[in-house]
């Protein structure tokens, strides 16, 4: 892995400067001859971009949300971030998806990343930052404004970089009992043909005096996908437990980072999607006229 470290570990100052430059450009106006002073409120810059280019029909259009989802692997960040993305009319940017896209490519770096991921290791900061910068630039080119980040930041270094170049409005930290979390991760399945995500685990945890019963029904595929389901290579009990251990060790400081800034919302998932989605909307003071249909 010596080659990997040389490829992926430039100086921290260089990382911050490079990402700051790319991030600022990704949110800045593309008007001819204009430039963005880093001291300017980037939300205002994003709002100016959104005025001329956003095509969202969301009732929340124009508010340019800058939100982050935290939570252990498998907790459901993608599920709820995606729903909020549709509701609020802003893109859902999942760094896990960006990594998987890179893993599907060929080359030395891809093979080294596969080794890290398959052993439950977290991808180094600078690689995630590079992928995210490119995604934000692509979004800027398409006229996107606002975003919901899923899977970033995972370290205080990443959080500091992000804080230095944009104003995150809210950080939603999803929580789930470890017993349920492990079962969810081991039950994840993907359709090898359409790419749909499903979960075959039926979670039913008895309650006691301190905790209520938790029931999470399986998210089963349609009949045409049943025979095409596959598991992720890294969804084994050993790898999942190691991934959770590393995550908890590395992200506790991130939670404290945002808690001190008054931006952290702790949200304990009470059960399956219908119950959890309704409660999350109430916690965020949002309304979804279609929630009964999509839950």
Curated annotation (Swiss-Prot):
Entry's InterPro entries? Adenyl_kin_sub (IPR006259), Adenylat/UMP-CMP_kin (IPR000850), Adenylat_kinase_CS (IPR033690), P-loop_NTPase (IPR027417)
SUPFAM superfamilies, A to Z: P-loop containing nucleoside triphosphate hydrolases (SSF52540)
Instruction: From the Swiss-Prot or TrEMBL record, state where the protein is found.
Output: Plastid, Chloroplast
| PROSITE patterns in the record | ADENYLATE_KINASE
Task: Point out the coiled-coil segments of this chain.
Answer: none
| Record EC number | 2.7.4.3
Give the range the annotation lists for the signal sequence: none
Q: Which GO terms describe its cellular component?
A: chloroplast
Named from the GO MF annotations, one term is: ATP binding
Residues of the region (NMP) are 94-123
Key word Aminoacyl-tRNA synthetase present in the record?
Answer: no
| UniProt-annotated binding residues for ATP | 74-79, 188, 271
Q: So what does this thing catalyse?
A: AMP + ATP = 2 ADP
Keyword set, alphabetical order: ATP-binding, Chloroplast, Kinase, Nucleotide-binding, Plastid, Transferase, Transit peptide
Q: Which Pfam families match?
A: ADK
Q: Which parts of the sequence are annotated with region: LID? A: 187-235
Entry superkingdom: Eukaryota
Q: Transit peptide, first to last residue?
A: 1-46
Task: Tell me the residue numbers annotated for binding AMP.
Answer: 95, 100, 121-123, 151-154, 158, 243
- Please give the subunit comment from the record: Monomer.
Q: What does this protein do?
A: Catalyzes the reversible transfer of the terminal phosphate group between ATP and AMP. Plays an important role in cellular energy homeostasis and in adenine nucleotide metabolism.
Q: Which family does it belong to?
A: Belongs to the adenylate kinase family.
| Protein name, as recorded | Probable adenylate kinase 6, chloroplastic
């Amino acid at each position: 892995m010596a080659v990997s470290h040389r490829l992926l570990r430039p100086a921290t100052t260089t990382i911050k400067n490079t990402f700051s430059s790319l991030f600022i450009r990704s949110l800045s106006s593309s008007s001819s001859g204009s430039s963005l002073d880093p001291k300017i409120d980037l939300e205002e810059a994003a709002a100016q971009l959104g005025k001329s280019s956003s095509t969202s029909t969301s009732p929340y259009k124009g508010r340019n949300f800058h939100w982050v989802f935290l939570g252990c692997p498998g907790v459901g960040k993608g599920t709820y971030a995606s729903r909020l993305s549709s509701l609020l009319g802003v893109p859902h940017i999942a760094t896990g998806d960006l990594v998987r896209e890179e893993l599907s490519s060929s080359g030395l770096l891809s093979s080294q990343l596969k080794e890290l991921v398959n052993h439950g290791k977290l991808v180094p900061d600078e690689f995630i930052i590079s992928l995210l910068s490119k995604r934000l630039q692509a979004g800027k080119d398409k006229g996107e404004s606002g975003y919901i980040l899923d899977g970033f930041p995972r370290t205080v270094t990443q959080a500091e970089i992000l804080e230095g170049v944009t104003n995150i409005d809210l950080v939603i930290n999803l929580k789930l009992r470890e017993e349920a979390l492990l079962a969810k991760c081991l039950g994840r399945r993907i359709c090898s043909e359409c790419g749909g995500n499903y979960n075959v685990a039926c979670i039913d945890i008895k309650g006691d005096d301190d905790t209520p019963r938790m029931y999470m029904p399986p998210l089963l595929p349609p009949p045409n996908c049943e025979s095409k389901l596959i598991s992720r290579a890294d969804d084994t009990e050993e790898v999942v437990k190691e991934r959770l251990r590393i995550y908890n060790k590395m992200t506790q400081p991130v939670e404290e980072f945002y808690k001190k800034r008054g931006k952290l919302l702790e949200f304990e998932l009470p059960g399956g999607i219908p119950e959890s989605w309704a409660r999350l909307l109430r916690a965020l003071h949002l309304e979804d006229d279609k929630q009964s249909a999509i839950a």
